[in-house]
Amino acid sequence: MVIFLAYFLVVNESEAFFGHLFKLATKIIPSLFQRKKERSVMNRDLENLFDPYQRNLEMDRLLKQLRNY
């Protein structure tokens, strides 16, 4: 591994290689934090979806219309 890194430090292609690694890191690192945020929102939505005590406002509106007829 050390020989591999030393080779890339000497050769001109090292700039492109490390530039590519840096570009990948800047895309991957923010996506890791974004996934956690999306997961927490999804979990909260699922908890609200399966909460038996939550009122369904759309259903209430339809039932009120039904009573009027």
From Swiss-Prot:
Record-given protein name: Antimicrobial peptide Meucin-18
Residues spanning the signal sequence: 1-16
Free-text comment on this protein's domains from its UniProt entry: Amphipathic and cationic peptide with an alpha-helical structure.
Residue span(s) of the pro-peptide: 38-69
Organism: Mesobuthus eupeus
The keyword Transcription regulation is annotated on this UniProt entry: no
Gene Ontology BP term (one): killing of cells of another organism
Gene Ontology CC terms, in alphabetical order: extracellular region; membrane; other organism cell membrane
